[in-house]
């Protein structure tokens, strides 16, 4: 999902970095003898193929010029798999890579599971009975897709993709989110990628690909061309836009070098990392956005302008022990300096928030905002009684506490480490325990005394089995995606955390689709105990999709 409204803002803010992708320009780039490395996060492709075959979403019959002939039950999943492979095929033909990396979402950190749970509770089966929640690790649907692709990728490499030397495939049994597995691959293969002078192309529409690309290109793979290829959603045809990450880095640097007070030495890495941290604060898949700080009211523009005209960096360097490919080595890393972040949070509270309040006062669209209504009624700024009222509007037991604010700051640090240094360096169990964020003023005060309790530490690669994750994220109407007897647990013994009826939070949203389901917190210890008590009753066949596997490397016979 990424960051709402971000790419629209991005195109307006950095138009020089976005171009229409054409085969002509691609060929011109290939003439430089830089082989292409193509990386695909397949989940977006899988969702599109499912919509196309099962006729929902963008492919509902009402949105089509004519109806397709009926497809009989039992054939449809295979048609989805074929369509996914066809989409991969077309991208390989378009980019002509030397190497290809394909990833499907595996089990995710708990912080991401919370967002996945919200999305799955608001999905509904199609008229034909298709449940898009099956696009989750541990389901029969994704397991069979992985087997299908493994078989057919070998055939494609041998008979059709003659310019491709190697395919790296990570299916849904390999732990980690798809896009993060792609960037873990880049970090792991850094030396070889740099030495080969690969031209890196990442395909996907998620806004957070821009953040991941910026960080990997400024901290690890600094010289290689790196671009994001994404569908042009404004085009009626299947056109692509190319986002030039190297040019984006240069543009951000030029803005800073022109406006920002000089430092000795001037640090390019800090500026890029600071930009990413500021973008995180408008909300993402792991954190609710800071109230009244959003893109559509101009909040991010104001914060960036303040940053580029103010002395100081948000990030700094520290020496830490690394894990993964540099295990045991002590190396410099970038981290957030929360005392340096404090002035920016204070600026949001004192300058950005009043602009949002004024916009809200004058706008005639969108849904009411509880916090803004209280502010306007009291004709006061964001004092403690106002923010407490804001949180109490959702739960009589929900109070803003120092612990909650510190959890939010810990999560910002966690997200930065995850995006900058990968899944091996984060605590997979960490999460922010609320659907609502503290205000900028609360965060500003907290940073003055905040001392992080977490660091860059090695964690187990995966702390969650696929079936356990399904128990945590699936709604009751999708219980059939779990095998016996786990499906019965969901609807009989775990009903407290899996309600059939839910309320939606529309507070301050511009559109209905932005609403967030208000769900009860999960008792993970209770779920884990029941899971451990019943998992041995699952069949051996079902348990095949509840394991962790490793990356598959498929190499061509022909030498390159």
From Swiss-Prot:
One of its GO terms (molecular function) is 5'-3' RNA exonuclease activity. It holds the Pfam family XRN_N. GO terms for biological process: nuclear-transcribed mRNA catabolic process. InterPro entries: 5_3_exoribonuclease, Xrn1_helical, Xrn1_N. Its EC number is 3.1.11.-. Keywords: Exonuclease, Hydrolase, Nuclease. Belongs to the 5'-3' exonuclease family. This is Putative exonuclease 059L. The lineage of its organism: Viruses, Varidnaviria, Bamfordvirae, Nucleocytoviricota, Megaviricetes.
């Amino acid at each position: 999902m990424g960051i709402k409204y971000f790419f629209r803002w991005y195109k307006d803010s950095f138009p020089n970095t976005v171009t229409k992708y054409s085969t002509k320009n691609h060929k011109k780039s290939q003439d430089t003898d830089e082989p292409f490395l193509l990386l695909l996060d397949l989940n977006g492709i899988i969702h599109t193929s499912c919509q196309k075959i099962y006729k929902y979403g963008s492919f509902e019959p009402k949105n089509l010029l004519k109806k397709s002939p009926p497809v009989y039950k039992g054939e449809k999943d295979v048609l989805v798999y074929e369509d996914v492979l066809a989409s991969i095929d077309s991208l390989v033909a378009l980019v002509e890579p030397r190497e290809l990396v394909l990833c499907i979402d595996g089990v995710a950190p708990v912080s991401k599971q919370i967002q996945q749970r919200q999305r799955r509770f608001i999905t509904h089966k199609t008229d034909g009975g298709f449940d898009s929640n099956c696009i989750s690790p541990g389901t029969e649907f994704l397991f069979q897709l992985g087997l299908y692709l493994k078989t057919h990728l070998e055939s494609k490499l041998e008979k059709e993709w003659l310019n491709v030397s190697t395919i790296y495939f990570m299916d849904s049994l390999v732990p980690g989110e798809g896009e993060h597995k792609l960037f873990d691959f880049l970090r792991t293969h850094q030396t070889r990628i740099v030495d080969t002078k690969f031209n890196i192309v990442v395909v996907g529409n998620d806004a957070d690909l821009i953040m991941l690309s910026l960080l990997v290109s400024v901290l690890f793979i600094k010289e290689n061309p790196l671009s994001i290829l994404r569908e042009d959603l404004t085009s009626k045809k299947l056109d692509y836009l190319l986002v030039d990450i190297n040019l984006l880095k240069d543009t951000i640097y030029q803005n800073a070098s022109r406006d920002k007070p000089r430092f000795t030495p001037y640090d390019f890495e800090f500026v890029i990392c600071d930009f990413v941290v500021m973008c995180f604060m408008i909300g993402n898949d792991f954190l609710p956005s800071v109230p009244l700080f959003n893109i559509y009211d101009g909040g991010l523009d104001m914060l960036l302008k303040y940053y580029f005209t103010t002395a100081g960096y948000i990030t700094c360097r520290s020496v830490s022990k690394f894990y993964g490919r540099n295990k045991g080595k002590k190396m410099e890393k970038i981290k957030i300096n929360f005392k340096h972040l404090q002035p920016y949070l204070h600026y949001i509270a004192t300058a950005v928030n009043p602009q949002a309040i004024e916009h809200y006062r004058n706008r005639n669209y969108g849904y009411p905002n509880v916090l803004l209504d209280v502010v306007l009624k009291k004709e006061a700024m964001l004092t403690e009684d106002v923010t407490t009222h804001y949180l109490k509007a959702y739960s009589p037991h929900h109070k803003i506490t120092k612990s909650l604010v510190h959890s939010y700051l810990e999560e910002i640090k966690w997200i930065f480490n995850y995006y900058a240094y990968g899944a091996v360096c984060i605590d997979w169990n960490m999460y922010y325990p609320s659907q609502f964020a503290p205000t900028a003023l609360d965060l500003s005060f907290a940073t003055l005394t905040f001392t992080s309790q977490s660091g860059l530490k090695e964690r187990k690669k995966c702390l969650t089995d696929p079936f356990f994750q399904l128990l945590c994220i699936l709604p009751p109407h999708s219980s059939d995606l779990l095998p016996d007897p786990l499906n019965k647990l969901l609807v009989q013994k775990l009903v407290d955390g899996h309600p059939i009826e839910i309320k939606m939070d529309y507070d301050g949203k511009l559109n209905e689709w932005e609403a967030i389901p208000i769900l009860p917190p999960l008792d993970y210890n209770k779920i884990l105990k029941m899971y451990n008590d019943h998992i041995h009753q699952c069949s051996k066949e079902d348990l095949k999709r509840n394991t962790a596997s490793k990356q598959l490397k498929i190499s061509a016979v022909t030498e390159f």
